Amino acid sequence: SASEALNKNCGAGELSPTDSWSWEDTRHSEHIMIKSLEKTEPGKIIAAALDGDGDRCLLIESTDKGCRVIDGDEMADHILRGAKGDWTLAASIESDLALSTSLSRLDANVEFIQTAVGDRWLSDALKNSTSNKIGVEDSGHIVLSAPNPNGGRCLVGDGAASLLATLCAMAVSEKPDKFTRGFKKRVSIKDTKRELWDGKNSLAEDVEEIIKSSLGDLQRKKIVGESNLLLLEGKGVSLGIRNSGTQAKTNVSLRVRANVNPEPPLQAMDEVIKFLNKHLV
């Protein structure tokens, strides 16, 4: 299709929030932007990519051995580290736990709201806030307040505006430390019978028991807009299971805070995936 041709091997749509490359890797990358990067000293912003419709942005930073993606969570953290006053942060259930659990280090006073996946849920969570607003997904969706052409203000997800806001925030000279990235892993179980999973039935109860037997008494959380989500959180761990909205697959997402050993949660995740492969495929 025309949209596939437009985005093939370029843009944010071909990048993952956790991607990184050695300089040797970049030379052989199929991604046009990554392949064009030249070796430089670490710690520099060397590229930025928008997605096909321009509402997402991801940055590329040079490292000691190559380069890596700066995802939406880190971009939002840069903005908040340069901020003052009262803010509301909305972040999806796929955002880094370290961002939402370390807000006390900031100079700004930040209220946190966890949302469903999708930038429309970020906007929905922020619409009634009277403070400064920012919504984020690690995929590079950032929702910010902007002037409304008809008067007042509105919420906008604009990749170019997100890029400029992040670069301006990076230029602030004195600011709090950045957050320490936690561990994240997502696995998609393909060809699932999605009608068998609703996040509340006996199958979900079995999965909850598997997780709690390994990780202890985590708390089940409900998120507006995620009708089939089973989300268990606590002790620096978040494990969620939800159906894809468009494809025959069920996604298992694990998030672990930076100071928590990821091995026990990973083992629990593996058990859940084996169980769901047996009962959903």
Model-derived regions: residue spans:
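Short, charged, surface-exposed secondary-structure boundary motifs
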Residues: 11-20, 79-82, 122-127, 145
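Alpha-helix C-terminal capping segments
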Residues: 37-41, 80-84, 232
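N-terminal small/polar loop signature for handling phosphorylated ligands or for N-terminal nucleophile
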Residues: 1-62
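Alpha-helix capping and helix-loop boundary segments enriched in small/acidic/polar residues
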Residues: 17-21, 67-71, 90, 113, ...
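Phosphate-binding and adjacent anionic-ligand microenvironments
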Residues: 46, 52, 85-281
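Cysteine protease catalytic core and zymogen-processing segment of caspase-like enzymes
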Residues: 65-84
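Short glycine-enriched, charge-decorated loop/helix-capping segments at active-site entrances
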Residues: 63-66, 149-150
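Short, acidic/turn-prone active-site loops that include or flank metal/cofactor-
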Residues: 2-13, 72-77, 94, 115-120
